[in-house]
């Protein structure tokens, strides 16, 4: 494996480019676990589209299902850089498992931590951080993806309860979650200002989650449709207040994009590792192909993308640790890292030649798994519009 050499230099604003001893320990723990428990069965799980319940349980025992959850709520109380290195190491081994973790941590736990009441935090975070419960994030609908301000799922107040009806689509962890954060419109006349978020326990009558099959990648992760038919949710399970739902969703997506970007760094690292190993072992014309200039060019391009993506992720994590606005930096990291992961996987397949087209080597899986990173948590095009807004001061997609 190619291990990045730490750069012990302070940036002008105090950001450091080397990991702390604690962060290095977390990286090594995650790497050892990934190489021992995740990598050996990744191909078979992908072939069988089999969700790894056993591995998720072991990650829970390590504390890796709640790394950034404060200790008082059952988590490890780590910072965002430590979270990033966990996602990177797990993503290098199997993006399906990294996706499960990202949804659990970035979209579910962090949303409750940032927006929940004290009672909600104490009720749900310990169960999520331990892995006793898995969570999911129900925003996308069959006809609503990037335009999250126009939800069709409805929530109507009935005494001390809200009654929710609607459907959600492409929900990671949806079929295995015990808790869903569901976004619904309380008053269509208010448009995005009428959206609210609800904590829905999935054993509630009227809730179902049929699994979606036939995905290009992330085959051993669970993806489902959420169907809510007269689902009654206690009023105290609203997350935040009416009108805050859209803001909660956008805030959560910042955390989600950070997780995706971190996992994509892992994919790129995996592509570099696999390509260097193969190029050093494969011979042609009487020498290892690693000595050919055009093969080195493919690998060098991957290394450049790896270093750039990792630094963008760490920059976003640094700002998140400081508690300052980071939407711009998180979008930059997600945009660059996801597209770079696709480029790296294509280059890695090219290095491997015909073998790269077979699942005998991991690089074809890296490509299939990388592609979805350019789509979920906001497409590449949405990230460009976000960056364009910061550059020009004009919001091309502001809710009307």
Describe the residue ranges of each PLM region:
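A short, Trp-centered hydrophobic/proline-enriched beta-strand micro-motif
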Residues: 131-139
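Short Gly/Pro-enriched turn/cap motifs at secondary-structure boundaries
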Residues: 101, 128, 143-146, 170-173, ...
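Flexible, glycine-rich active-site loops centered on histidine and acidic residues
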Residues: 109-115, 137, 149, 189
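Short Ser/Thr-interspersed hydrophobic loop/turn segments at strand-loop and sheet-helix junctions
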Residues: 63, 87-91, 184, 200-205, ...
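A short core secondary-structure module
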Residues: 160-161, 165-210
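Flexible, small-/acidic-enriched active-site or ligand-binding loops
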Residues: 150, 203-234
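Alpha-helical interface subdomain recognition
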Residues: 1-103, 115-120, 127-132, 145-148, ...
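Short glycine/proline-enriched turns and hinge-like loops at secondary-structure junctions
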Residues: 78-79, 147-149, 173-178, 191-194, ...
């Amino acid at each position: 494996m190619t291990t990045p050499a730490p750069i012990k230099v302070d940036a002008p604003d105090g950001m450091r480019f080397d990991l702390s001893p604690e962060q290095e320990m977390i990286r090594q723990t995650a790497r050892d676990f990934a190489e021992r428990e995740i990598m050996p069965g990744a191909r078979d799980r992908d072939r069988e589209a089999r969700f790894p319940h056993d591995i998720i349980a072991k990650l829970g025992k390590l504390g890796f299902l709640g790394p950034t959850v404060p200790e008082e709520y059952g988590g490890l109380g780590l910072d965002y850089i430590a979270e990033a290195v966990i996602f990177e190491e797990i993503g290098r081994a199997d993006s399906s498992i990294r996706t499960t973790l990202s949804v659990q941590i970035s979209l579910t736990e962090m949303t409750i931590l940032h927006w929940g009441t004290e009672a909600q935090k104490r009720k749900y975070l310990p169960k999520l951080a331990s892995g006793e419960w898995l969570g999911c994030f129900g925003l996308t609908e069959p006809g609503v993806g990037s335009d999250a301000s126009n939800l069709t799922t409805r929530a109507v107040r009935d005494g001390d309860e809200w009654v929710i009806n609607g459907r959600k689509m492409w929900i990671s962890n949806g079929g295995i979650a015990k808790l869903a954060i569901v976004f619904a419109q309380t008053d269509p006349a208010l448009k995005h200002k009428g959206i609210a978020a609800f904590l829905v326990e999935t054993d509630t009558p009227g809730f179902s989650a049929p699994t979606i099959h036939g995905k290009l990648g992330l085959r051993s992760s669970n993806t489902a449709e959420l169907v809510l038919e007269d689902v009654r949710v206690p009023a105290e399970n609203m997350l935040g207040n009416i009108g805050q739902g859209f803001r909660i969703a956008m805030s959560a997506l910042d955390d989600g994009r950070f997780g995706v970007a971190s996992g994509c760094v892992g994919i790129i690292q995996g592509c570099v590792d696999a390509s260097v190993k193969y190029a050093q072992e494969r011979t042609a014309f009487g020498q290892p192909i690693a000595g050919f200039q055009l093969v080195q060019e493919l690998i060098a391009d991957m290394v450049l993308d790896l270093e750039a993506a990792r630094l963008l992720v760490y920059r976003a994590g640094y700002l998140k640790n400081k508690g300052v606005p980071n939407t711009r930096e998180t979008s930059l990291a997600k945009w660059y890292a996801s597209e770079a992961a696709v480029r790296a996987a294509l280059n890695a397949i090219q290095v491997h030649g015909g073998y790269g087209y077979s699942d005998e080597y991991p690089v074809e899986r890296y490509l299939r798994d990388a592609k979805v990173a350019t789509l979920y948590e906001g497409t590449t095009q949405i990230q460009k519009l976000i960056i364009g807004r910061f550059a020009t001061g004009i919001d091309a997609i502001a809710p009307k």
